[in-house]
């Protein structure tokens, strides 16, 4: 399949378009960005493509859980106009979401493929990614893998169950958030005992087990902790998943509490519809 569609032209959808249009025919639809859309509706997009990437917000509700309403309504719309399409969800969703959508909608095969982009360098991150993970039912995952292979000849592509693929995204984002909170606490300790934190990091990184990223404090934005549209909502979503399944998320909650301490401005709360639901 050489034609793909993309719903949503935020940084994820834009990265897919820019990174794949040299090898595939790409059509787009974004109800809020008509100037970036080649189609006027999901219905039109379905007529022109068979594989559709869903790149839409999954913001945090007031209780910390993941708001899936935008993704769910979009998959429902694809299903309505589908002639056995494949919907590839790039939005971060809790484990079990893809399975549930496949049970609910019969005209579309839903696959999950997490993105690992940074908002600051999303175009380069997409073009230079070192792994692609695809979770969901066969033959849809095989079709999606073959589609990706036309663009990324050398990249490792892994097919797995959708629950695993969904959890990998939370594992990655929440581990990196943990590093940020740890770094901020270490910086506080170093300041109190009159030790140069940057030197501690420099010498500590001689141990190759410690990754170099997410240890600078303040961070790239000049502030403590983590903010933006991803880490806060994803950490809280995983905390909510843990509690719902009888797991006490001691570490994750400590990460969040430290972040609230070192980033009191809570900039994510201003990102209505992206980091937090509009109801918040």
Predicted features by range, described:
Residues 1-280:
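Structural/interface elements that position substrates and couple domains in central-metabolism enzymes
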